[in-house]
Amino acid sequence: MLKVESLYYTYPDGHEALRGISLTVHEGEKLALVGANGSGKSTLLLHIAGAVKVQQGRITFRGQESQEVLRKNIGLTFQDADDQLLMPSVVEDVAFSLVAGGMSRSKAHERARAILDSLGISHLAERPPHRLSGGEKRIVSFAGVLAGEPEVLALDEPSSALDPRARRRVIDFLHKTKHTIILATHDLDMALDVCTRAVILSEGSVACEGTLPELFTDRKILEANGLELPLRYS
């Protein structure tokens, strides 16, 4: 479904963020991208979602190599949900991309409310985003992405700054959705709860990959890549 081949990326300051990364994501799969801070997870996710232009290498979605195809089919959420919640109300935030794409305001709001209802948060529709809890903001950010009807959800640290209850709510959503998921996280316990396969990144390269939970029970592999055993195995 999605293939990354020999992907390199260097920032203007000379930092090599990605060094020849290759990986494949299969349709319906829930894949974890894990690694220590600075391993390249977020940069890779931005490329996969078409938010950053490829410098060297290629990314194809269903055989098509196009930044526009990636943007259309892969929905990206940022580590900080506040970066996606900029409108006066939740329903306006969720409807924003639809209105920007040419849909009438009334129809966009109708669709946005249907999405909020499907996620069990229709009661938040008129609430200002800045008055939401961390967990509510995260789910609303998912709603905004779902409005674009992507085939793949690319999620950057979705458990960041969440309390246990909010974290559980996010995990429940990820369990229920039928979308293909690429989950970039350092939260190995969340990866175990959601994903069946993981790719470990280290200094911009693929260090290893494997199935879960097997990969995350190997202390030597995890420690070699700056990671610790998940809490459930500690």
Where are these regions (language model features)?
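Conserved ABC ATPase "signature" region
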Residues: 106-124
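Conserved beta-strand-loop-alpha-helix hinge in the C-terminal portion
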Residues: 205-228
